[in-house]
């Protein structure tokens, strides 16, 4: 959303008010709206549920979202979805009013997005951000998407996981067909990507790690780009890129003017879109798992980080992998490349030093009720229950055995 690394916009956790993107940060939809686009989000936001942080205040004209990081989630503080929500028939916040929907969540988000896109046809160009809750756990899919995986003898969680993915695949297919039927597919860049590696214990390309890990398996994601007549089908680009390269890329395509350009971490990918082998200056990209305890930002500097360039991945201070020769991360080659490891560690420290003053949510007080709960209760004239006090968990060594 910002063209910057999460820590640099205040996001160091997924809950506890630390999921909020700090106010005043220019966003991608704001830039596109200023460039003449209309903007819509359909699905997951997860950058703050309170009013000043919600997407209608961050550049989106059309907003159709669930709360928190997943449908039905609820945590201490403002982060939470509408009470009682499930993957089927969820209550969705549509331009600050809840709508009780019917169907499976992914189908609902795509249907709403396509209805909105159809209404924009012949008007302004549009930016549609479709962020599905699936395949987030719990792994629940429509029955029609589970049968073949059940017949294959898979476990119930794997059945749900793959069923959710196949449902997404079908919805993307519906979207591409609709763009063609509207006659705008040649004018539309369609991007499919995910936000992290898989959380389920399934095939991961022989990469080490999964969601929550700073290893390749936790951070490497698919990135498929489709633009008939502009991008050559079947082209593989092997150059490393990041999610925060999207904002400067969209700025170049849409002739937008990103504000605070000197603070962007991303780089326009347009040269690689034109030529997969275009010259490209190597760079260090930093990953950190975050999610430390309250007040522990500084001492968590070395707790779960990695630095990546085109060929090598430094994991922690003393482990270096050659990702070209060893994509499964089995052989530590730091003794063979001490100077490179030194540079990567120095780059990381510089990055973390710059991130610390931007971690503005570390001491934010927790609200009494989830924001979406309060909005839901008010809209439906429901009584607001007393605040449930969540006691802090005891340190592991002090927990009583059951």
What residue spans do the PLM features occupy?
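Long, compositionally biased
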Residues: 365-371
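Acidic carboxylate-rich catalytic motifs and surrounding loops in phosphoryl-/glycosyl-chemistry enzymes
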Residues: 318, 363-364
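Acidic/polar, glycine-enriched structural segments that form the non-catalytic walls/loops
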Residues: 353
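Formylglycine-dependent sulfatase
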Residues: 1-316, 323-346, 350, 359-360, ...
